[in-house]
Amino acid sequence: MFDNNTIPVAEKDRITSALLKWGIRIDQGTGVIDYIENTKTPPVLCSSIHLIRHAETVAVAKHEFMSDTSDNCIFTENGVEITKRQSLELDKYCFDVALYGPIARVINTKDIIMQTKQKFDCIPIKALHGINNTGWEYKTYFDLENDPVFIAREIESNMFARTPLGSSWGTVIANCADVLEYINENHIGKNILLISQGSILRGMQILLRKRAHPWDDFTVSGMYHVGDDSKKKKDYGIISRVY
């Protein structure tokens, strides 16, 4: 079992308070979350939010984990082409601004999108930072399926669990809360495009209660493309509705 006491108090407090503001309680022992019934959550003051996940990487194609900086973060040719095609279709969404995250594969995705002339500006947002798998780079699900930290983070959904230099799901969701607060303060009534990671999409969906329970329909095999996924629809470089 993952020892939550190994996580700094300030980090746990940030996660706990950010999620509580959105009506989500965390069991401090297990790190498991659930919605608090009949709670009023903050409003979202923009008109719409969509997200484009970074382009497909070598890690995705090889079913490997990647960190923020590992060499397997480079894009596949297919990933670049899909993102280019998506960039040609953005006019119809009438985006006012695009916000993009701080890691290289997200910045590079933004650059691909902006190779097509767009009608919106791009703003870097440090908080738009999804899961960081430092310590697990180049490993597969089968390398990690018996790892206690992996089990805690991905199977038991412990919001505090992470590798020593990686990040937790709790931090990702707290980051999403910061992004929504930034949007409310700076982009009221606007149509927003986020360029980031798949974990940010899930974090946003959790805050905005898109499912009855935060982790409904989440599977590790689905998130990390375990086994033969040649017939599975992938959303790398593809736009998704958030709000």
Residue ranges and their predicted role:
Residues M1-S48, I131-D143, E185-K190, G203-Y243:
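Acidic, low-complexity terminal tails and accessory targeting/binding regions
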Residues F2, A59, S70-E77, M114-N175:
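Phosphate-handling substructures
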Residues F2-K117:
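Active-site-proximal alpha-helix that buttresses catalytic centers in soluble enzyme cores
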Residues I49-H50, K190-G198:
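Generic beta-sheet signal
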Residues H50, I123-I125, S240:
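General small-molecule cofactor/ligand-binding pocket signal
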Residues V58, R105-I107, G130-I131, I200-R202:
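Short, active-site-adjacent cap segments at secondary-structure transitions
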Residues E89, I112-T116, Y182, N186, ...:
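Active-site catalytic microenvironments for nucleophilic, acid-base chemistry
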Residues Y100-G101, A174, I195-S196:
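Short beta-strand scaffold positions
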